[in-house]
A protein has these predicted regions:
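Internal intein/HINT superfamily modules and their associated LAGLIDADG
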Residues: 1-106
Length: 106
């Protein structure tokens, strides 16, 4: 559904992130796409639409803070999702993604 994809890409463009993340000492880096926010219904739309990834619910120790929902997808599945959203992402995000992929090819 293109309108759903465009909506999710817009939310991701504003609130999400992607890049190469360290897995720990001597283990190298992996690609990750993720988004974290207080609106759980929006986060669950990512899981429902893309049918991959995982959601972590973080309950803060401080009662004044809100519960947050974190959706994350690693490796090739993360790249696949960003590629699907790419036409709807800002030019800056598109350039960043292509730059990351160029770095992986080296």
């Amino acid at each position: 559904m293109p309108s759903q994809l465009a909506y999710l890409a817009g939310v991701f463009d504003g609130e999400g992130s992607f890049g190469m993340w360290s897995k720990g000492k001597k283990k190298g880096k992996e690609f990750r796409a993720s988004i974290e926010m207080c609106d759980g219904d929006v986060i669950f739309k990512f899981l429902s639409h893309f049918k991959m990834g995982s959601i972590t619910i973080r309950v803060p120790k401080n009662k004044k803070h809100k519960v947050t929902y974190h959706w994350r997808v690693n490796h090739d599945k993360g790249k696949q999702i960003v590629r699907e959203m790419l036409p709807f992402l800002s030019k800056r995000r598109q350039a960043k993604f292509h730059g990351i992929l160029s770095g992986l090819d080296k």
